[in-house]
């Protein structure tokens, strides 16, 4: 075969097969319809996910890699939450941190996992007072972070959710005051910035008491379309039996809006890292997963890490902890049915 014909043959073969950039999977855009998450094809999505630890921390320890995501996929996850601490964002710098996020988003895309980007602060954003130094931020920095995320990921369908602020709390007045109206205004301002910068990701809004309490939503919801709400109903937030209290505090929201429990989990009183409010046993796991299954609520388990608590595994061979054994089985069972 002449060289010119060989060249033409190779060119046609390349076009037929496609370049690597062309064959990377693009996930279906997720949007809000009523109280559900819907794909572009009209499929209802109820997510079962896992929390990564901070990508900055994982990269420093050599574990921010595709193998980490592959293991989450094996556990049955359909959603991965990236908790971005303000201190890590500042110390690494915007451009370098975006490179970390881009790698994670690319691995998630290849594996068919959707992503939540979470601004992982705890405290009172109105007063700019926080639970401890690692959560320190400002209103301006928070707005700028979301402008950056919106611009950067506006055309990326894998990044399905922006969790605007991890855990709002005034810590019983130790961090001053913040009314629901004041919090609502901050969240609505953030959503305006995100939307004006072209992002289609769904904003996730938490309530007070470390993101547990959504009772204010009943009479005074966030004034924005296409959003979802968040709760972190750890076991010690309420005494058993939990279910009726959950419904009164946050579960009622799922009748009208999509709801994502972006942190759930438990550990025994003598387990490594045991602390308030996560101490419990498998009865909590059974109750919270059953409640979510019954009510079509998405959840993300905290945390896929052997150091942060309550941890899901004990070592980098991914040996499950007590809660890890429970949730791995629950996620895999749900994945098998769906």
Positions of PLM-derived features:
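N-terminal signal peptide c-region/cleavage motif recognized by signal peptidases
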Residues: 16-18
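Bacterial N-terminal signal peptides that target proteins for export
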Residues: 1-8
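Extracellular glycoside hydrolase catalytic/binding regions
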Residues: 29, 61, 133, 143-161, ...
